[in-house]
Curated annotation (Swiss-Prot):
Taxonomic source organism: Homo sapiens
UniProt biased composition (Basic residues): 922-932
Extracellular side: 29-692
Protein name: Protocadherin gamma-A7
Occurrences of domain Cadherin (ranges): 29-133, 134-242, 243-347, 348-452, 453-562, 570-682
Biological processes, Gene Ontology terms: cell adhesion; homophilic cell adhesion via plasma membrane adhesion molecules; nervous system development
Function: Potential calcium-dependent cell-adhesion protein. May be involved in the establishment and maintenance of specific neuronal connections in the brain.
Length: 932
């Protein structure tokens, strides 16, 4: 059945509220539908989608559903058609009894916005009930002397239907003694009465049988009958009379069972049996005999069951008093039940979200519930509260509906579960309350990035580590949960020395363990700067970075490397020159060594292991300087052999040795003469001496020509390098000198004097060689390490410690640096007296040729053996570049002597203790020139 026009009016209000943006709850009206009772399940009631201004498909999308307060769901929503239909058979009499109008009210909830819309459905009565008498046999006793016109009440029929479908009329079967009169009460109930039309004669007819028919006004009408048996008795002049025509009593609903409510009382003036009055219920529903008891003798009415105001608040019944012969009268009894506060409030959850995300906006509805109290008046007035320290509040909706909404931002990391206590309290005395707990889980959102305990770390690993070794454990924490807290680790893409970081180290993405992918070499790589990123698995993922400095620790894996004297490529031994006039402390040469390691592993000490003449020479423990320990004697051999050991201070220490050959003579010719005198006068090879001499002369000529060409090339190269150094001098000016071991000057010296002419002393056949240039790797810049260990070891250098003079530590100075005159180069470009001389004119060249020819002649005579060292090129002190410290850049700026205040210097006075002999060499050269 379609909605009545009144429903259409509300529909108009609803549509108007949508157009104006006004919530439906603001309208005071309700949507009204009507439907007949006893319709089939699924019968159409109204187009709810249209009346709500929705499309049928939107009912499911927006969560539209019915909220009913009763226990039985009478109606349902057809989601496909958008209509309101019956959920089953509806019996109007069961729902509304005999109320004139039967309205069923419920609410429609739209869950997406938590809005409620009140709905009323009127149940239309149909004629589905037949009027029925409480008893099919009605017994009436009438005295035979009863005057005509006396009326006798009859039991009325009941019809649960209402309106025209209810009881409308009574009919009495035709007879000559009685007629029927119908009376209407205040509630429009029709009461049949039997009217005596003629005097009865008991002797004529003792019993009269009549039929009473009750009919309703339905279409078609329905009816039922009752049999009336009228018994004619002897004369009974008086009928019982009640003391009150109507009895009223008010009792609280919590009276105990068996409580006497009231007593009805009737008086019969007759005597004997005619005056004995009995009481009985006359007009009651089937439920009343179970609720109340009427004492037939005393007229007391008491309770058989407990009263419940919430179920029935008012009872109406009729009692009759009858004497012995059968005369009776009636009275009405009204029982009013008073409400007491015996029902606690009830909370009915309509909609509840058990879990909400922590980033839920403020004002979000998380629960919708209904409060009710079955009591009445103040006993039924309910208030609801929640604790004040929660980020929620209550908002009242229509009727007794409440919303629970958020008032503050939620944070799962602070509190992940809320136990919300709803306390509903009524207004009774004393008040009753009921608590309902709502457990609200706060769902996690990815709002916390992973965090490291520190923003940067320093990690150390010793070099020569095995591949795959674990270096460090990186850990990060994420305060989120589940996938949002799953952390993966990664290394930022970067390059180190032209190679990607992933070729050096790797990280386990799950555990954060950092692994070495290669064995590190301190001399090649000392530090790696890494950036570790921690990602969580949220959506979108969050990350944080941490910087990690990986330092490679040095190990003593490199032995000392001797830079000077360098080993000749032909296997010969270099020779150094010591004049016989040298005083004690005269600097003969200097052993220069470096160690690619750093710190204590690179601290070097020098020791004279073996000498052909013990006590003649001494080696500086930290400087490597070879000096005369005493004055040279005539008995000292011309050729002295020294074995010098260089050892670092690592654990375990590593060492290297070098063999030095020192010629004791004042000049090269003297060396040649002395060496020639040592050779035997004749030998097995004299027969080809002439051939050797010819070959030697030719060779010397070729060598001289090559020497001149090489000398010119070196000059050009030096000039070119000087230009480059001047251009780059500004870039190197800011580099601290402490960052270099001191090898650059040595390398420059070796590059300058790498071309040597060497005459072997071990072969009878003298020859010339051109050694290959020496190439020295540049040392890696390193920071000095602070150590407390002694520079000397207690095992290898014990005896050196005993002879080591105490040295006072002094601040470093720069007097060891080369002057312009001390830098390597040809003698012609230098003017100092302390520098070695080179042939720089024709006379010197002729002298060199003459000396070589003389040497060749002596070799042909078998009277001498020429020998040359790498430092002298096999020539005399006059023509050979006398090796002094001016030619070798000092590295002692990087040498720290533990426990002393001395800083190694290169001052000529400190080194030799006397003026250099370079000036004498120049004088000799001038004398020879004049002589020639």
């Amino acid at each position: 059945m379609a909605a009545q026009p009144r429903g259409g009016d509300y529909r108009g209000f609803f549509l108007l509220s949508i157009l104006l943006g006004t919530p439906w709850e603001a309208w005071a009206g309700r949507i009204l539908y009507s439907v007949s009772e006893e319709t089939d399940k699924g019968s159409f009631v109204g187009d709810i989608a249209k009346d709500l201004g929705l499309e049928p498909r939107e009912l499911a999308e927006r969560g539209v559903r019915i909220i009913s307060r009763g226990r039985t769901q009478l109606f349902a929503l057809n989601q496909r058609s958008g209509s309101l239909v019956t959920a089953g058979r509806i019996d109007r009499e069961e729902i509304c009894a005999q109320s004139a109008r039967c309205l069923v009210n419920f609410n429609i909830l739209m869950e997406d916005k938590m809005n409620l819309y009140p709905i009323d459905v009127e149940i239309i009565d149909i004629n589905d009930n037949v009027p029925r008498f409480l008893t099919e046999e009605i017994n009436v006793k009438i005295m035979e002397n009863t005057a005509p016109g006396v009326r006798f009440p009859l039991s009325e029929a009941g019809d649960p239907d209402v309106g025209t479908n209810s009881l409308q009329s009574y009919q009495l079967s035709p007879n000559r003694h009685f007629s029927l009169a119908v009376q209407s009460g205040d509630d429009e109930t029709k009461y049949p009465e039997l009217v005596l039309e003629r005097v009865l004669d008991r002797e004529e007819e003792r019993v009269h049988h009549l039929v009473l028919t009750a009919s309703d006004g339905g279409d078609p009408p329905r009816s039922s009958t009752a049999h009336i048996q009228v018994t004619v008795v002897d004369v009974n002049d008086h009928t019982p009379v009640f003391s009150l025509p109507q009895y009223q009593v008010t009792v609280p609903e919590n009276v105990p069972v068996g409580t006497r409510l009231l007593t009805v009382h009737a008086i019969d003036l007759d005597e004997g049996v005619n005056g004995e009055v009995t009481y009985s219920f006359r007009k009651i529903t089937p439920k009343l005999p179970k609720m109340f008891h009427l004492n037939s003798l005393t007229g007391e009415i008491s309770t058989l069951e407990g009263l419940d105001y919430e179920e029935t608040a008012f009872y109406e019944m009729e009692v009759q008093a009858q004497d012995g012969p059968g005369s009776l009268t009636k009275a009405k009894v009204l029982i009013t039940v008073l409400d007491v506060n015996d029902n606690a409030p009830e909370v009915t959850m309509t909609s509840l979200s058990s879990s909400i995300p922590e980033d839920t906006p403020l004002g979000t509805v998380i629960a919708l519930f209904y409060l009710q109290d079955r009591d009445s008046g103040k006993n039924g007035e309910v208030t609801c509260t929640i604790p004040e320290n929660l980020p929620f509040k209550l908002e009242k909706s229509i009727d007794n509906y409440y919303r629970l909404v958020t008032t503050k931002n939620l944070d799962r990391e602070t509190l992940s579960l809320y136990n919300i206590t709803l306390k509903a309290t009524d207004g009774g005395t004393p008040p009753l309350s009921r608590e309902t707990h709502i457990f609200m889980q706060v769902a996690d959102t990815n709002d916390n990035p992973p965090t490291f305990p520190h923003s940067s770390y320093s990690v150390y690993i010793a070099e020569n580590n095995p591949r795959g070794a674990s270096i460090f454990l990186v850990t990060a924490q994420d305060h989120d949960s589940e996938d949002n807290a799953q952390i993966t680790y990664s290394l930022a893409e970067d390059t180190i020395q032209g190679a990607p970081v992933s070729s050096y180290v790797s990280i386990n993405s799950d555990t954060g363990v950092l692994y070495a992918l290669q064995s590190f070499d301190y001399e090649q790589l000392r530090e790696l700067q890494l950036r570790v990123t921690a990602h969580d698995s949220g959506d979108p993922p969050l990350s944080s970075n941490m910087s990690l400095s990986l330092f490679v620790l040095d190990q003593n894996d490199n032995p000392p490397e001797i830079l000077y004297p360098a080993l000749p490529t032909d296997g010969s031994t270099g020779m150094e020159l010591a004049p016989r006039s040298a005083e004690p402390g005269y600097l003969v040469t200097k052993v220069v060594a470096v160690d690619k390691d750093s710190g204590q592993n690179a601290w070097l000490s020098y020791l004279l292991l073996k000498a052909s003449e013990p006590g003649l020479f001494a080696v500086g423990l930290y400087t490597g300087e070879v000096r005369t320990a005493r004055a040279l004697l005539d008995r000292d051999a011309l050729k002295q052999s020294l074995v010098v050991a260089v050892q670092d201070h690592g654990q375990p220490p590593l060492s290297a040795t070098v063999t030095l050959t020192v010629a004791v003579a004042d000049s090269i010719p003297e060396v040649l003469a002395d060496l020639g005198s040592l050779e035997p006068s004749d030998g097995p090879y004299n027969y080809d001496l002439t051939l050797y001499l010819v070959v030697a002369v030719a060779t010397v000529s070729c060598v001289f020509l090559a020497f001149v060409l090489v000398l010119l090339a070196l000059r050009l190269r030096r000039w070119h390098k000087s230009r480059l150094l001047q251009a780059s001098e500004g870039g190197l000016a800011n580099v601290p000198t402490s960052h270099f071991v001191g090898m650059d000057g040595v390398q420059a010296f070796l590059q300058t004097y790498s071309h040597e002419v060497s005459l072997t002393a071990d072969s009878r056949k003298s020859h010339l060689i051109f050694p290959q240039p020496n190439y020295v790797d540049m040392l890696i810049s390193q920071e000095s390490c602070e150590k407390n260990d002694s520079l000397l070891t207690s095992v290898d250098f014990q005896e050196c410690k005993e002879n080591l003079p105490s040295i006072q530590q002094a601040p470093p100075n720069t007097d060891w640096r080369f002057s312009q005159a001390q830098r390597p180069g040809t003698s012609g470009s230098q003017n100092g007296d302390d520098t070695g001389t080179w042939p720089n004119n024709q006379f010197d060249t002729e002298m060199l040729q003459a000396m070589i020819l003389a040497s060749a002649s002596e070799a042909a005579d078998g009277s001498s053996t020429l020998g040359g060292g790498a430092g002298t090129m096999g020539l005399s002190a006059r023509y050979g570049p006398q090796f002094t410290l001016q030619h070798v850049p000092d590295y002692r700026q990087n040498v720290y002597i533990p426990g002393s205040n001395a800083t190694l210097t290169n001052a000529a006075g400190k080194r030799d203790g006397k003026a250099p002999a370079g000036g004498n060499g120049n004088k000799k050269k001038s004398g020879k020139k004049e002589k020639k």
